[in-house]
């Protein structure tokens, strides 16, 4: 479960975006943004196996796409944090900014927050106060049909293999560290076995030779 895509836009004008993996996010997002009214509101659209959560405030839309089993409370917690950071950084400049004007700077913020809210499951317990629960109850979920320019039904296509490069690097690093740890553990175990064996042999020989100085076995 993860936040797959995030975007900040003014109407249909995209100001900043970030994708966790490959997909036709922009094609789908353009249709979603066109359906969002300009007044302040919050809503979740449902389409297939995906959810589109957004907050619209002062004509600026903060939107993210998640799997349908991703907690909505975490999605809106992410959007609220993105909104706060975006407003603090840009303020009224967003009302007249050109397309992608903030992308070079703010896409890294989206990436960091996307990763944080996707991975930190403790947010549910820490941040989901009763007020947030009540607020979430007031945010509706609506089904939405998307149509491509050719008139065909538009589906969100996700290619998570694009994110497997980072995952494979992490896996290799983890495997290497695990192998190193297992090797050290085996070395320590071997040393302990050798020491115990030597002590055991010494005790047996001492018993057979009449004592720890081996008086019956050592010639004077």
From Swiss-Prot:
CDD domains: Longin, R-SNARE_VAMP7. Disulfide bonds: none annotated. Residues 7-110 form the Longin domain. Residues 2-188 are cytoplasmic. Gene3D superfamilies: 1.20.5.110, Longin domain (3.30.450.50). Residues 210-220 are vesicular. SMART domains: Longin. It is found in: Cytoplasmic vesicle, Secretory vesicle membrane; Golgi apparatus, trans-Golgi network membrane; Late endosome membrane; Lysosome membrane. The modification Phosphoserine is found at residues 167-168. It holds the Pfam family Longin. Keywords: Acetylation, Coiled coil, Cytoplasmic vesicle, Endoplasmic reticulum, Endosome, Exocytosis, Golgi apparatus, Lysosome, Membrane, Phosphoprotein, Protein transport, Signal-anchor, Synapse, Synaptosome, Transmembrane, Transmembrane helix, Transport. It is a single-pass type IV membrane protein. Residues 125-185 form the v-SNARE coiled-coil homology domain. The keyword Transport applies. One of its GO terms (cellular component) is Golgi apparatus. Belongs to the synaptobrevin family. Component of the SNARE complex composed of STX4, SNAP23 and VAMP7 that binds SYT7 during lysosomal exocytosis. Component of the SNARE complex composed of STX7, STX8, VAMP7 and VTI1B that is required for heterotypic fusion of late endosomes with lysosomes. May interact with STX17. Interacts with PICALM. Interacts with RAB21. This is Vesicle-associated membrane protein 7. It comes from Mus musculus. The gene is Vamp7.
């Amino acid at each position: 479960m993860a936040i797959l895509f995030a975007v900040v836009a003014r109407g249909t004008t995209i100001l900043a975006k970030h994708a966790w993996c490959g997909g036709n996010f922009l094609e789908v997002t353009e249709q979603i943004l066109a359906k969002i009214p300009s007044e302040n509101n919050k809503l979740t659209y449902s389409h297939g196996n995906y959810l589109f959560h957004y907050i619209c405030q002062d004509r600026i839309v903060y939107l993210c796409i998640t799997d349908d089993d991703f907690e909505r409370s975490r999605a809106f917690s992410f959007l609220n944090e993105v909104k706060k950071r975006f407003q603090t950084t840009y303020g009224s400049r967003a009302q007249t900014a050109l397309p992608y004007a903030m992308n070079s700077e703010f896409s890294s913020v989206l990436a960091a927050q996307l990763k944080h809210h996707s991975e930190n499951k403790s947010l549910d317990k820490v941040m989901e106060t009763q007020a947030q629960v009540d607020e979430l109850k007031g945010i509706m979920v609506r089904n939405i049909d998307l149509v491509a320019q050719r008139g065909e039904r538009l589906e969100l296509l996700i290619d998570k293999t694009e994110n497997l490069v980072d995952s494979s690097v992490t896996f290799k690093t983890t495997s290497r560290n695990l192998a190193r740890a297992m090797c050290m553990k085996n070395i320590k175990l071997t040393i302990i076995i050798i020491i115990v064996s030597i002590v055991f042999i010494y005790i047996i020989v001492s018993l057979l030779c009449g004592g720890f100085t081996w008086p019956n076995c050592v010639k004077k």
